[in-house]
Amino acid sequence: MKLLKVAAIAAIVFSGSALAGVVPQYGGGGNHGGGGNNSGPNSELNIYQYGGGNSALALQTDARNSDLTITQHGGGNGADVGQGSDDSSIDLTQRGFGNSATLDQWNGKNSEMTVKQFGGGNGAAVDQTASNSSVNVTQVGFGNNATAHQY
C-alpha cells in the first residue's frame, strides 16, 4: 500500500490484483484526493477528506470483487467516481452543505452503489449500466436533489 499525503494534492495509482489504497486528508480548502486509479481484481480504494472545498476523483476498472469508498466531511466538497467491474461496490458518504457527487458504474453484474448525503443543498447524479445490481441513495436534510438511472 502506498500513501501520499500532500497539502494540495494527493494521488493514488495502482495496477494489479489484490491491491489497497488509502488517501486520508484533513483540513479544508482545496484538497484533491484524486487520480485514484485502482485496477485489477480484489482491489480496494478509500479516500477520506475532512474540511471544506475538497474534491475526490476515483476510478476502478477491470476490478471484479472490488470496493471503492469515499467519505467527505465538510461543505462544498465534490466527488466524481467511476467503476467498471462485476461483483463490486461503491460507497459514498458526504456530510455538510453544498456537496456534489457523480457516480458511474458500468459493464458489471451483481454490483451495488450506495450514496448517503447529510446536510442541505447537496446533489447526487448516479448512473448504473449493470445487470442484477442495485442503487441506494439516501439524503437527509433540505434542498437536496438526486437523479438515478439504471440501464
UniProtKB/Swiss-Prot annotation:
GO biological process: amyloid fibril formation; cell adhesion; regulation of amyloid fibril formation; single-species biofilm formation
Signal sequence interval, chain numbering: 1-20
Cell compartment(s), UniProt: Fimbrium
Alphabetical UniProt keywords: Fimbrium, Signal
Listed GO MF terms: identical protein binding
Region (Disordered): 71-90
GO cellular component, as recorded: pilus
Induction: Under control of the CsgD transcription factor, part of the csgBAC/ymdA operon.
Keyword presence, Signal: yes
Main subcellular location of this protein, as a coarse class: other
Keyword Cell membrane: no
Domain of life: Bacteria
InterPro entries recorded: Curlin_rpt (IPR009742)
NCBIfam families xref list: PRK10051.1
Function: Curlin is the structural subunit of the curli fimbriae. Curli are coiled surface structures that assemble preferentially at growth temperatures below 37 degrees Celsius. Curli can bind to fibronectin.
Membership in a protein family: Belongs to the CsgA/CsgB family.
Protein name per Swiss-Prot or TrEMBL: Major curlin subunit
